């Protein structure tokens, strides 16, 4: 298409744009730039020729100094030219295929060019948002934001209005216009209840443009300074606060500032088309741009804050969905209650301990009996120390001494056992001297002797303190016979 139309730099405005964007220039030629704006506004083909020349200088140019000069010319023309040039620049095709493509990473643009393009797109999107035929740049701007592109912060002191809205002339003869003005007045009254009121200059009869008095101008500027102060405080808070670590009090103050500033912006937008003072209009437009910038920062801040909150809540929901591999508290309590319900009284515990001790004693007795059964009588007698009859009386006495030493029987019972042993030894000695044949008379005599021996037996319940009498020396044969009988008893 450009080939059919010829060289873009052949037209009068194209020639001037070529000179204004020459790479040999050290800085911008503002006189030439303003001359370009005049040609665009005064000629019929000026907007199209200028647009083609600027597009030619930017598109595919690797000399970023020339690109930077062309962007400056383009910005100057947008701010100083009318709607005809805005329609061409705000086209979505131009913004995407020329401006955005220039700052792609493959072209490796310098930071100054990158920030310049993004600043132009952002400022145009804010300025042309309310114009239906200039929303192409708005769509590109919103698309870039959705993709996560961070736009640089604009210098609030260097901002200037892109275009000044035309003065609105109201027709006093139209009733519908009068109704709309009255409705706007009521809306301003409602907003004044929620925000710091801006003074509304007196409306002249016939709803003509407002010409404020010097006193009203001074009051209006004092209110605008208050608005600028709120914007400055809000901007500083957005700079200092961290979205993920904001305190509730700071967040509440920030939200209150946001609501107040939005109400103030609404009042400013209502005053801009009605103020006839050009200087006041420029101040209102500049404050409006500052408000738009701080609102964008607040939206980005809220997006980060709400995003982190949603992430934390999703992690909490994920943690609740995980299977708990630890012990179930209900099962643990149930087990504890079951153990508490078991009969573990002192009686049952004592009975269990006694059964263990009894089984231990039985095992010891069985081991001793097995040892006795497994060894011969001669081996057993080797461990027995035979002393004088006065000390120990036979094997029974030795066993009694062992039991006394182990604490099996008391000392008094040992004395009783000695008396019984003496009685049995006497009977055994008398029966050993008798012949093997026994008649009835001898048996009767034996019974009488046993009866006499029973009379000589001491009282078991109250044994004498002196102890049993010492055996006479004549009892030695009887003791040997007793030992033989004991050997036979153990052999069985």
Curated annotation (Swiss-Prot):
Q: Which CDD domains match?
A: GAT_TOM1, VHS_Tom1
Region span, Disordered:
167-215, 450-492
- Enumerate the InterPro entries for this protein: ENTH_VHS (IPR008942), GAT_dom (IPR004152), GAT_sf (IPR038425), TOM1 (IPR014645), VHS_dom (IPR002014)
Where is the protein found, in the record's own terms? Cytoplasm; Endosome membrane; Early endosome membrane
Q: Which domain of life is it from?
A: Eukaryota
Residues covered by region (Interaction with MYO6): 392-463
**Topology of the protein relative to the lipid bilayer:** Peripheral membrane protein
The residue ranges of the GAT domain are 215-303
What does the UniProt PTM comment say about this protein? Monoubiquitinated.
Biased amino acid composition, Polar residues: 167-195
- Check the record and name the Pfam families matching this protein: GAT (PF03127), VHS (PF00790)
Task: Say if the entry is tagged with keyword Ribonucleoprotein.
Answer: no
Q: Name one GO molecular function term.
A: clathrin heavy chain binding
Cite the Gene3D superfamilies for this sequence: 1.20.58.160, 1.25.40.90
Keyword annotations of the record: Acetylation, Cytoplasm, Endosome, Isopeptide bond, Membrane, Phosphoprotein, Protein transport, Transport, Ubl conjugation
Q: Which residues carry this modification: Phosphoserine?
A: 11, 160, 176, 180, 208, 355, 376, 462
Sequence motif KRKK, residues: 48-56
Tissue specificity as recorded in UniProt: Ubiquitous. In adult brain, it is highly expressed at the mesencephalic level, in the hippocampal formation and medial lemniscus. In cerebellum, it is highly expressed in Purkinje cells and granular layers.
Per the record, the covalent cross-link Glycyl lysine isopeptide (Lys-Gly) (interchain with G-Cter in SUMO2) lies at 385
Role: Adapter protein that plays a role in the intracellular membrane trafficking of ubiquitinated proteins, thereby participating in autophagy, ubiquitination-dependent signaling and receptor recycling pathways. Acts as a MYO6/Myosin VI adapter protein that targets MYO6 to endocytic structures. Together with MYO6, required for autophagosomal delivery of endocytic cargo, the maturation of autophagosomes and their fusion with lysosomes. MYO6 links TOM1 with autophagy receptors, such as TAX1BP1; CALCOCO2/NDP52 and OPTN. Binds to polyubiquitinated proteins via its GAT domain.
Domain-level remarks: The GAT domain and the VHS domain are required for the interaction with polyubiquitinated proteins. The VHS domain binds to phosphatidylinositol monophosphates. The KRKK motif within the VHS domain is required for binding to phosphatidylinositol monophosphates, with a preference for phosphatidylinositol 5-phosphate (PtdIns(5)P).
Annotated family: Belongs to the TOM1 family.
Per UniProt, subunit arrangement is: Found in a complex with TOLLIP; interacts (via GAT domain) with TOLLIP (via N-terminus); the interactions leads to TOM1-recruitment to endosomes and inhibition of TOLLIP binding to PtdIns(3)P. Interacts (via GAT domain and the C-terminal part of the VHS domain) with UBC/ubiquitin. Interacts (via clathrin box and C-terminus) with clathrin heavy chain. Interacts with MYO6. Interacts with TAX1BP1; CALCOCO2/NDP52 and OPTN; the interaction is indirect and is mediated by MYO6, which acts as a bridge between TOM1 and the three autophagy receptors.
Q: Which PANTHER family match?
A: TARGET OF MYB1 MEMBRANE TRAFFICKING PROTEIN (PTHR13856:SF32), VHS DOMAIN CONTAINING PROTEIN FAMILY (PTHR13856)
Protein's UniProt name: Target of Myb1 membrane trafficking protein
Native source organism of the sequence? Mus musculus
């Amino acid at each position: 298409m450009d080939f059919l139309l010829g060289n873009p730099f052949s037209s009068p405005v194209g020639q001037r744009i070529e000179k204004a964007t020459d790479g040999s220039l050290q800085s911008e030629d503002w006189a030439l730039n303003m001359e370009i704006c005049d040609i665009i506004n005064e000629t019929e083909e000026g907007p199209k020729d200028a647009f083609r020349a600027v597009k030619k200088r930017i598109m595919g140019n690797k000399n970023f100094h020339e690109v930077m000069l062309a962007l400056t010319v383009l910005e100057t023309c947008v701010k100083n030219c009318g709607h005809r040039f805005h329609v061409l620049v705000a086209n979505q095709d131009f913004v995407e295929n020329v401006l955005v493509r220039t700052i792609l990473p493959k072209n490796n643009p310098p930071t100054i060019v990158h920030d310049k393009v993004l600043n132009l797109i952002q400022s145009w999107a804010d300025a042309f948002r309310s114009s239906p035929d200039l929303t192409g740049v708005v769509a590109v701007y919103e698309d870039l934001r959705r993709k996560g592109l961070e736009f640089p912060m604009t210098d609030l002191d260097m901002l200037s209005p892109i275009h000044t809205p035309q003065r609105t002339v109201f027709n006093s003869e139209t009733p519908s216009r009068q109704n709309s003005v009255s409705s706007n007045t009521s809306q301003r009254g409602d907003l004044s209840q929620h925000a710091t009121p801006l003074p509304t200059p007196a409306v002249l009869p016939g709803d003509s443009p407002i010409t404020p008095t010097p006193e009203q101008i001074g009051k209006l500027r004092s209110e605008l300074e208050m608005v600028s102060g709120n914007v400055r405080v809000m901007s500083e808070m957005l700079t200092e606060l961290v979205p993920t670590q904001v305190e509730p009090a700071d967040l509440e103050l920030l939200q209150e500032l946001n609501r107040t500033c939005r109400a103030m912006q609404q009042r400013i937008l209502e005053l801009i088309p009605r103020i006839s003072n050009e200087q006041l209009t420029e101040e209102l437009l500049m404050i409006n741009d500052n408000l738009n910038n701080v609102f964008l920062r607040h939206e980005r801040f809220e997006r980060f804050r709400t995003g982190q909150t949603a992430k934390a809540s999703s992690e909490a929901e994920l943690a609740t969905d995980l299977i708990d591999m630890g012990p179930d508290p209900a099962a643990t309590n149930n087990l504890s209650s079951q153990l508490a319900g078991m009969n573990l009284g002192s009686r049952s515990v004592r009975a269990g301990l006694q059964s263990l001790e009894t089984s231990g004693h039985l095992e010891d007795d069985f081991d001793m009996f097995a040892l006795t059964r497994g060894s011969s009588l001669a081996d057993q007698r080797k461990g027995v120390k035979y002393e004088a009859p006065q000390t120990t009386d036979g094997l029974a006495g030795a066993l009694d001494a062992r039991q006394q030493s182990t604490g099996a029987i008391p000392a008094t019972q040992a004395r009783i056992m000695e008396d019984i042993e003496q009685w049995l030894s006497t009977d055994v000695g008398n029966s050993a001297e008798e012949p093997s044949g026994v008649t009835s008379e001898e048996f009767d005599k034996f019974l009488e002797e046993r009866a006499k021996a029973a009379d000589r037996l001491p009282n078991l319940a109250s044994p004498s303190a002196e102890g049993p009498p010492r055996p006479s020396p004549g009892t030695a044969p009887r003791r040997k016979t007793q030992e033989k009988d004991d050997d036979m008893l153990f052999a069985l």
